[in-house]
Amino acid sequence: MTDRVDISRLLSDMRALKAQTQVFQRPEALRGEGLHNGMRTLEGVEQPTKVPSFGDLMTQAVSKVNETQKASSAMADAYERGVAGVDITDVMIASQKSSIAFQATVQVRNKLIEAYRDVMNMPI
C-alpha cells in the first residue's frame, strides 16, 4: 500500500485544474472571413463551457485535504494493527502529506480573511 508521488498523475491533475480555471477561451478557428458591419462573425465557434465557481473550487480543495487526512489516518491505523505491506516510511510520508495539505489550507484561509478585511476597510 504505497502512495508514492507519480509525476505524470500530478501533471495531469495540474492540467485538469488549469483547464477548470480558464475563464476565457480563444476560438480555435474563426469562420466568416469577411467583415460584416465592421465585425467578424463567429460561426462555428463552440460556446464556452461552464466554469466552476470559486466556492466549488474551494469545496473541492477542502474535500481533497480531508481525503488525504483520512488516508493518512487509515494508513497509521493499519500500521498500528500490524497489517502486512504497510511500512513506517509510507505512514510518515502520508502523515507529512496530510500535514502540508492542511497547513496550505490554513494559509489560504488566512490570506482570504486578510483580503476580505482589506476590502472592507477600503474607503468608499
From Swiss-Prot:
Predominant place of localization: other
GO molecular function per UniProt: cytoskeletal motor activity; structural molecule activity
Keywords linked to the UniProt accession: Bacterial flagellum
Biological processes per GO annotation: bacterial-type flagellum-dependent cell motility
Cysteine disulfide links: none
Transmembrane spans: none
Organism: Cellvibrio japonicus (strain Ueda107)
Protein name per its UniProtKB record: Flagellar hook-basal body complex protein FliE
Family statement: Belongs to the FliE family.
Cellular localization per UniProt: Bacterial flagellum basal body
One Pfam family named in its UniProt record: FliE
